[in-house]
């Protein structure tokens, strides 16, 4: 599905993930779905001629003396999925599609053990801090130290990085990062651990004070195990 970049604006990419090539029936015909949506005229879609999963594009925004600065965080799996293009070409395609010269691509290393290679379980945009810098919530504990360190360094160059603090880290604790946010509420996946589920909710309440009393948790462990949360 297209990924929402901001209110009323969606990015539409080529959805043809390598991990579904043996089960093509699960590859959504994005154009057909959009065509059947009666509300489609209310939104703007940007076509990007790149093979990218929506879960591998996390959008962030900051402020400086010249106005807004925009960021897209992706893992380097995008480079592998578009191997005929150079990194600079991929970056140019994305920047030109948005017509936003102040758009920065932040690349994270791709852990090959993660077949999805998505960033939406690694980093979550929280907002803009008092210094105008984007603030992000991250979960790096599931990665080997060298990969986690490289991810942290790449993110900290641009963002205020807040780490998800839990008493223990489950193989599914990345799901806490992959929450759903609307203008009215935030829904956080629960993974069936009463302690860490509560800790995740508490940290969201600290990071999103405007959403206090509107942050909810839905238990999804079995669903996430079966479907990766997608």
Task: Please tell me what each predicted stretch does.
Residues 1-230:
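The feature marks the mature, well-folded catalytic cores of soluble enzymes
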